[in-house]
């Protein structure tokens, strides 16, 4: 069972990295940032209340995801504060909505349903315009058995904290 979970996390992370790398040629003049470190050295932290388990949630799950920004023109700390819609599990995430602080002009985000902690996220400005995207990788270290979150999805309390990293693309102004 452990080997299947590890294989799923590794495969999903690889798909997320390929999707992010594939978008790197999307637009001339776009800005690319790291957020929460790298997959090899994640520094982002997400906290979840209540914790996510392997049973679909019956209500929203509140979360805060925060981490340092890196890359050319990307400094400071970005934070998402929001909630996952009912139905979230550790393996299949539900859509989410969040307020964003720390990366102007981004003020809010909308995440799509995801598999194993990776999923597309659209970044919006205060006027409702899409100004960027990011590929969430919330379960970056769960393949590591020394990670405290490794088995928490199987407990009644669930996964309440995890490390992650991802890449952000801010679209060039037209």
For each feature predicted by the language model, list its residue ranges.
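Secretory targeting and sorting signals
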Residues: 1-26
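Processing junctions and N-termini across compartments
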Residues: 20, 27, 67-68, 83-84, ...
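Cleaved targeting-peptide boundary
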Residues: 26-35
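Extended beta-strand/beta-hairpin segments
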Residues: 35-36, 71, 168
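Predominantly extracellular/secreted and cell-surface proteins with exposed
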Residues: 42-138
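Extracellularly exposed regions in secreted/surface proteins, prominently low-complexity, repeat-rich
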Residues: 139-174
